[in-house]
Amino acid sequence: MSFGRWAASIGLEIHLQLATVKKLFSPAKVNPLAQPNTCVAYFDVSLPGSMPILNPEALKFAVKGALALNCEVANVCKFDRKHYFYPDLPAGYQITQKEIPIGRNGFIPLSAGLDNVPDTQIPIQHIQLEQDTAKSTSAKNPSRILLDYNRAGTPLLEIVTKPCFHDVNTVSAFLFKLQSIVRFAGISEALMENGGMRCDVNVSIAPVISSENLNELHFKNNGVISVEKSISHFPQLGTQLARVELKNLSNVRNVVNSIRHEVDRQVSLANMGVSWPSETRGFDDITGKTFPLRNKTTSDDYLFLPETDIPPIILSRSYVNSVLKSLPALPDELFQKLTTGSHAISHKEARTLLSVKEYYHYYRNAYHHIDSISHVNQSLKEDALRTLPYWITVELVGKVREIDPSPNINIVPPLQLADIVLLVSKKKLTAASAKLFLRSLIKSPSSKPISTLIQEKNFGTIGDSEKIKACVESVLSKHSKQFEELKNGKTSLIKWFVGLTMRELRGQASPKDIEMEVQSSLRREK
């Protein structure tokens, strides 16, 4: 079989639950953890006579989201009805924005430094404010389903990209970046595991018609450009074949794996000369395959009509500017700040600190605490500030993750960690001893001053040279064979003896001081 040259084009539709206190058009509270059907107002279940009242907090969050994603904000907030019949939609229509979305023509920047993919901008076609549906689950009786209306009416922000993706690395980087932006903006938790962020994927393939740079592209055996590698200069493509929408993808891993399978499925059919329908498909994360759900619907099928119960709301320039002023610094700005100037931390450390909003705020609080101490000389401060990112991103996050996969690093308050780092810089605590002490503090948190805890748990640095000397001599005598090898010139054993002595002293002595004692013992024996 002779294969053509194919490339995939991928577009995303993301639904974000906004972190409002109340629902979009009713006074019911938003609480994903509440017992089923306990956060429901009359309008949420479309009881006759109930009317929608727009939640101003949801509108503000939507405008904030549009600004955070570099969109042009609409001059008016106007809603439409999207009609379709499904049990989780009691009114028979969803209130959304078809004619005038809240934001258009935005973009999310991706960079090699922060996002670990080639520098690019992902165009946002539009974002719209709409209501979520009820949550349906299967009942024991297969002819029935269970409906929880707690979710019905929760404000959603739908974000639609152009079909500009050609590889899964950029797709996953985009999704993680979007999560980071909306979390720092304070408008959504964007947790995919509980439905707070849901992703649909549009996948199509097209023939490669340009002959430039083909040698630089990685074609798989079936003739398609691999979706595994990011490509800076993508070739010109012909007419797209039938587009398939992949629905209900619950995490980034499923998004990536569903794209891989669907691209290969479409290419296999195309190579055999078989066409396929434009349809909606699901993804089975056990088999790793997509499966048909229903035929693809068009806009006409939904019979969009204006929502006459909610009058248009003018979004004045002063209102939009006031929302813009409330927007905090976002990841790209913070990455630039962290990796330059007085901070100048590594890209890897900055990426970790910005991967979770709480990590960044933890770092900022610890940094300001160290920087504000007046009785510490400047060189010690600079040393502590230089090593602080390591202690947070590697030692603290790493050790807390051993206990909890979704770590709460505030189990050790930032001021306590700052004091530990300062003591290491002052050489009142060795790095090895500090790591052991930090582990004990994570397991048994305490509000006592760090200096008191170190004394109580006997973690302070051993400055007594006689004690270090005695411990070194004890270690050397226990391992006389290796000491003989050392005396005969096997100098690599010096580090080995230092490690053994460090273990005996619980890391409380400086490796440099221990090595000096080992060298002294070696000279005496010679």
UniProtKB/Swiss-Prot annotation:
GO BP field: glutaminyl-tRNAGln biosynthesis via transamidation; mitochondrial translation
Record localization: Mitochondrion
GO cellular component term of the entry, any: glutamyl-tRNA(Gln) amidotransferase complex
PROSITE patterns named among the record's database cross-references: GATB (PS01234)
Keywords noted in UniProt: ATP-binding, Ligase, Mitochondrion, Nucleotide-binding, Protein biosynthesis
Main location: mitochondrion
Gene3D superfamilies found in the cross-reference section: 1.10.10.410
Pfam entry (one): GatB_Yqey
E.C. numbers: 6.3.5.-
Single GO term (MF): glutaminyl-tRNA synthase (glutamine-hydrolyzing) activity
Reactions this protein catalyses: L-glutamyl-tRNA(Gln) + L-glutamine + ATP + H2O = L-glutaminyl-tRNA(Gln) + L-glutamate + ADP + phosphate + H(+)
InterPro entries referenced in this protein's UniProt entry, alphabetically: Asn/Gln-tRNA_amidoTrfase_suB/E, Asn/Gln-tRNA_Trfase_suB/E_cat, Asn/Gln_amidotransferase, Asn/Gln_tRNA_amidoTrase-B-like, GatB, GatB_Yqey_C_2, Gln-tRNA_amidoTrfase_suB_CS, Gln_synth/guanido_kin_cat_dom
Note: This protein may be expected to contain an N-terminal transit peptide but none has been predicted.
Primary role: Allows the formation of correctly charged Gln-tRNA(Gln) through the transamidation of misacylated Glu-tRNA(Gln) in the mitochondria. The reaction takes place in the presence of glutamine and ATP through an activated gamma-phospho-Glu-tRNA(Gln).
Similarity field: Belongs to the GatB/GatE family. GatB subfamily.
Self-association state and partner proteins as the record states: Subunit of the heterotrimeric GatCAB amidotransferase (AdT) complex, composed of A, B and C subunits.
Name of protein: Glutamyl-tRNA(Gln) amidotransferase subunit B, mitochondrial
Source organism of the structure: Schizosaccharomyces pombe (strain 972 / ATCC 24843)
